[in-house]
Amino acid sequence: MEQLHLLLASGGGSKASTTITPFCLARDHASTSSPSPAAVAAPAPPPEATSGSEQSIHGSGTGLQSSEAMIKAKIMSHPLYPSLLRAFVDCKKVGAPPEVVGRLSSLAVVTDVPQYSGDRCLPAQQPAADPELDQFMETYCYMLTRYGQELARPIQEAEEFFRGIEEQIDSLALDEDVSYDYEDEVAGGLPEKSAAFGENEVTTTTRRHLMNKYSGYLNSLWTEISNKKKNSTGHLPRDARHKLLQWWHLHYRWPYPSEAEKAALAESTGLDKKQVTNWFINQRKRHWKPKPAAAMDAGFLQMHPRYGASSSSSPAAALRVEDGGGRRSAYHPRGGP
């Protein structure tokens, strides 16, 4: 538009100053007559023409400014202008510092006033309906709204991710507090100085100090507990096992110790009565094979010849004699008691 005004202004000045000769007439005139320096040189424009061109340029600039002001007035007087400005401010808020967000929010509140005083566009001065302007405002409102949503989505996802990480860290910190409390209870509790503080006031440095202080005691206690577990699973000490084997070899024919014998073995070996009982049960299952009744009777008579002339030829009678007659033996050979 400005170039059009300039072209019109320059055209008017040239008509007022000189007369343009067509190219064909100028060529015929040059062939018939010799050119003169005054005719070749273009005459200087008069001062009136120069001042007229400057006035036309100034007038074109003023016209452009007035057209821009008119377009601004149309946009700001449009009903969708507050929505357009609010969408633009929302885009500016994404990722901005809190103080900047506050200023932008206050600006959006000011622009929500029906009569916006940017160029003092009153309702009486509102232009007529413009379908092209309506489409422009609707399109850019939609575009700015979508753009603000796309800008805010990564920030929202990042905030959700950080919240999840913080929750995991808090849960780990709670588990660590519980573990430290358990270890402190095993070690005998906190010292008197640290017991005065609350659980939340115990720092990580204090916990590390306590762990370093009681770590040796905890390790020795754990070793002792592990050894007791091993012993309770059947791994008896060597001396105790040796004494039990001695009794086993001496009573191999009938390796069933009585309750009194179990108590004596438990006292001599340092084991529990239950451990002694379990050891004999396992030993009989693995290493004891009872002999037939006839072989046992013959072997018994050979080992105890004084019972051979007894009035009763049954080994059961001999066993009853050996037990003192008042208590029956647990062994009953073939033939019944």
From Swiss-Prot:
Ranges of Low complexity composition bias in the record: 309-318
Disordered, as annotated region: 34-63, 307-337
DNA-binding region range list: 228-291
Residue span(s) of domain ELK: 205-225
GO molecular function terms noted in the UniProt entry: DNA binding; DNA-binding transcription factor activity, RNA polymerase II-specific
Principal cellular location given in the protein's record: nucleus
CDD domains linked to this entry: homeodomain
Subcellular location: Nucleus
SMART domains: ELK (SM01188), HOX (SM00389), KNOX1 (SM01255), KNOX2 (SM01256)
Record keywords, A-Z: DNA-binding, Homeobox, Nucleus
InterPro entries: ELK_dom, HD, Homeobox_CS, Homeodomain-like_sf, KN_HD, KNOX1, KNOX2, TALE_homeobox
GO cellular component: nucleus
Classification via Gene3D superfamilies: Homeodomain-like (1.10.10.60)
Sequence similarity: Belongs to the TALE/KNOX homeobox family.
Protein name, per record: Putative homeobox protein knotted-1-like 5
Species in which this protein is naturally found: Oryza sativa subsp. japonica
